[in-house]
């Protein structure tokens, strides 16, 4: 039998985002270089923490690895929002906005979405396509209509590309591959 001891498998109590990447300043993340080196058609892995051995722990939502579906659950104060912020930032550091973008659905009154936008300056994470909060019911309904419209738009673009390239099927991974090869003109992000 395997015997675990607390000393061998102790997780760090706190690691901030920059520390996780081994840098001291945002500029040292070299996001533009990381964007150029990434290949979202092969992997969507991004660091989300440090494991018990002090190594980066990565999550990959590519369909060929951990998969694109997940659930985050926990008690109040357990770190759900911190995890989401870390994961969104980590994907943004590693993938160009043409490759990965986010619509945040925030039912905490906009507090989570506020982590990605400075209300004073208007500067926001370039990957942030929009936010939906529970504060305005009319806005929430408009946002859901917009999401449905975007799904129809993507289906149309995929169908056009499928016909133009004589492909049987096209999914987001194949489409992005064609985009990076210059075979289609419009970027579509995950």
Model-derived features: where do they sit?
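P-loop NTPase catalytic phosphate-binding loop
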Residues: 1, 27-165, 181-190
